[in-house]
């Protein structure tokens, strides 16, 4: 079965709906299958943003031109693998140019609403976080739901000479210090999501991070993001999360249509019955639509 066949399978249960409503719902479901997530990544220079992206995503990279002068400090890259893609937005680091921090705050406020998720990357051994804290409470609070903190370069945490290069794992003492750092970041920022700890260059901690990241994404974004992950990171639990997210997003299409249109009660009953059948089918054909 191919992607078109998967979508055709979703059409069959819709046949009992009036044509206009059926077309509306089908179009919105098709939009879900073509959705392009937008993920922001921020952090000071040297935090390892590029290495983290390379560790997570496999898609072919191409720059996205932006003619808007107000976003001249923002770099956009499209990652494409197969029929799906996502956009990475590289946001300017805070606290590195005091004269422009106010400008950056305004920039973030403009851009954050369009992002599905922001990965805020912090070096595991970075102790100068007061500016980050000020920026978080000064500009990012309304968007907490979209922010996932990532402690990167776990291999640099002291005692760094104890990092096991053979197994790419931290020593017991490093693990203890990483837990302390994780707790310190949690206490400082009070994030809504768990703080992730990784070494992107060593490939340590990224599976756990991906699991957390998938839980933080809106339902519409989980499946297309899963298509861009390196194969070893697109585990069955991750695929299951994405499959369920797609089902939830499809269900929401029906819920929105039912609540926003003036429909007679008998038709609403039919919509709910069709909804359950289509959501079940969406989960069943998920692999053919996205992989």
Where do the protein language model's features map onto the residues?
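Canonical P-loop GTPase G-domain recognition
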Residues: 155-227
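Conserved G1/Walker A P-loop phosphate-binding module
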Residues: 1-91, 95, 281, 288
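Alpha-helix boundary/N-cap detector
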Residues: 1-20, 172-176, 180, 237, ...
